[in-house]
Amino acid sequence: MDRISLLPDDVVFKILSFVPTKVVVSTNLLSKRWRYLWKHVPKLDYRDPSLVDTEHWRASRFVDKFLLLHEAPVLETLHLSLSRNCPPSDIETWISVAISRRVRNLHIYRYIPSTGPIRLPRSLYTCETLVSLYLLLDFTVDDAPFMFCFRSLKVLVLLFAKFSSDEIVNRLLSGCPVLEGLILIRRNDNVKNFTIAAPSLQRLIAIDCRSQVPGDDVGFVIKAPSLKSLTLLNFSPHSGFRSLVKMPDLVKASIKVRHGDSKMFMGCLTSTKRLALCLQPPLDSCPIGVFNQLVSLSLCTCSLGWCRLILNHTPKLRVLRFEQRQAKFYQLLDPLKRCCSSSVDVQTQWEQPSSVPKCLISSLETVEWIDYKGREVEKKVVMYLLENSRQLKTMAIRSLKSTNDNEKLKMLQELSSIHRICTKCGLSFT
């Protein structure tokens, strides 16, 4: 600690900004110099470990005291992870104080279910200093100003926001002229068509988990032509993604949608290099365009019908992956692992292409199959790929964890007996 004490204040503040705030405050016991240094650290990072109603006051008291005594001219970051019982009035006050301190990064998390929704202070909607805003809590946006003004905001994360109308969503995003990253998880709101119109947006994750929707003609409308990374997930039984625009700079896309126009989706994704799909089986006549840049494709096994269709349109494909995970509900903040279909939607038939796709002849090198069950349709797909992929180097198959040793041995014997057109192809089975 003596060596650190020799450093200039600015350097010490930088070091302390990487330390939890409780530890930072405790440094006031080290010496007279350290007694006041913590007050100038431009970051408050508090994570409340309590989940019981009788202890939430400890978090309120600590945060109140820190903000009251804090003397830095600018509060760079306010990061709060709070228990579900933290009073909404306290959170609203802390947000207001942070805005008055010209906060740049405002990250508020509250465990759900909570004691009640939060009404964001109106001053937040015109905070021009914000660069990143994370609101992972149950909050309502209904008393918003006519215009939002987030001139500096580059990253916006909204989980479980309750917007009162389509118009408020439009006004919010139009007030973010330099927005680059957006994450949305919808649970229940009053928005019919959630329009994401953001010309500067480069990264988007949009997830619809609503159980009830106001009508049938609802969903996301995405107008973001500069996207480089796109993730769309729909677990709602009644809504879908209404429309997309062409995204010529798209590099990575993951689409898991129970309802929607497959033709519309595929035609807008042709520039991507990495693609993951979990969609309704396509119609034979579905035009999808040519994926000239695609090198990695991940298909959910509920969508095996896409395999035959898309292989004919991916001349440079090098990696092909199959998987389906639906046995349990993954945590909401990690829904990318979850199949959007029910068990009855798993495809049981597959027809091989009428002619061998170009990628199987010249580019496909790796095939992976996660949670292989040994079903007849799975064996047919594996057999076709082994018998026709001339450049294939690796076929890696991982069985379900619940598969017993006898079943694994039988699967391995069946797979090993399949003829491989590429003699250098290695078969890995676990």
Swiss-Prot record:
Q: What is this protein's name?
A: Putative FBD-associated F-box protein At5g56440
Quote the PANTHER family the UniProt record gives.
Answer: EMB|CAB62440.1-RELATED, F-BOX/RNI SUPERFAMILY PROTEIN-RELATED
Domain named F-box: which ranges?
1-49
Q: Where is the FBD domain?
A: 349-399
The record's listing under PROSITE patterns reads:
FBOX
Q: Which Pfam families match?
A: F-box (PF00646), FBD (PF08387), LRR_At5g56370 (PF24758)
Coiled-coil positions: none
